[in-house]
């Protein structure tokens, strides 16, 4: 073995010598030939990273135009949470004697916004890990012991997405809307940034904001700075630039008709494995919040003011074979084929190589679109970072699924035609037998039938899963009724049976909480929405970081908690595939003049 493995103890004669040596070793590249020096360097570096996130966070408040007011100090307790698919919340409690209490309670109008930011690492502040939000409620509280406090309730800046409407045609005023619905087929990140940019332009871009609010002059106050509004980097709310040529996210169809963008984007982003994150950027930050615009130079890509930047991020873990926008439609085909074929033909648990209880992607693996294995893995052991984990195995709740209440329309029409035709022939026979003159009551005899027998034939549909019958045994739950569309023996009825079959299936779900820094550090090795793995028993389960929560108070140190997965039942893959196909069908309808679109 090469290298000198002896240990140098010359500086260990005094405590000061030890400290000087440790400081010198953490600031310079270690001598890899000395294992103790290399170990101390790596250990000190790891500990420094952990300690950096144990500092008291930097809390600041800002005015309605996001201009600095003051640092918030002397807090009694702080709880902030950022959520992947919704608006996170925060609560800060300060003493009533705090000098900011009077300002927050009395020295401002209730309509005036106050912004709040929290930097988890005050010595290395960055827009990428900053929590930014709006104070929505200020409570003056007196408890039973006579202690007066002020409680600040905040909501994360992602809440803005719930208050931006997606216009049917954002380039025209609401009084003139043609076509009746906005449709955009594109890769998810690009499509999301386009629809949000257009609807922000309605608010901040003077050449668009004034014409689209021609009958609403009050909105003109939002573009007081006409010259500055021409620059999207000067808007208070911005969209992170996405290079459409290298956007590999899954192709989707976005449609809106004056719904809020949170609702418009929720299902397409879930299907594409993307998330919408709201960053709070300050002019003090070293880097631009538009990294894909960096080819122009960081100076040209920097916003000109403090702002909120919405970013569409692909967290699916999938990278396509071409590395370009072509991967989007190819991935759509592969995933839809897996949803429609693999999850229907392959019985649950038959193709599950990793043992996590979910059918592995088969067609996606063939075409090169299977998600990559996560780099961050939390394992069980004596020093594990897993706080608690729960594996739930839910049994099947029905052998038979039933749906319906109405017969197919064509069957009711055929039945009506047959009965009315028979009655009309009966009327002719009566007239012939009783004489060649009109008999009272015979004309219009067929009009006696007014659909009394509609929805009596093939109005109900059932499906019994033979595999469940054998596995559940004699005492298994028997039946489940799925409401659905209510028409049996149609494509809608078949989908209703499938939905009911999915809801009553046996499945395995997981939920876990992770302690930060053991060994992975949030916002250093991974961030919100990233796919990480955690060990439960002998199986590694993969899920996304759905929430990051930071809390501390006067008696407890800073605690960072991570939530993996969501408390939502996994969606039926066939329903996802049908929603995708329906989107393309509706898009075709717009070109052929469908009444629902034009």
Roles of regions detected by a PLM:
Residues 22-25, 52-59, 114-118, 241-243, ...:
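Generic detector of short, locally flexible boundary/turn motifs and exposed helical patches
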Residues 221, 226-235:
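Glycine-rich, flexible loop motifs
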Residues 231-252:
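Short, conserved helix/loop micro-motifs enriched in His/Cys and acidic residues
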Residues 2-225, 252-258, 262-272, 278, ...:
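Assembly/oligomerization scaffold segments
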Residues 283-298:
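Beta-rich nucleic-acid/ligand-interaction surfaces
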Residues 74-108, 254, 263, 321-598:
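An acidic/polar, Gly/Ser/Thr-rich interaction patch typically located in mid-to-C-terminal regions
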Residues 70, 182, 239, 246-247, ...:
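A generic structural signal for ordered alpha-helices
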Residues 274-281, 401:
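Broad, structure-driven detector of short, well-ordered beta-strand segments within folded domains
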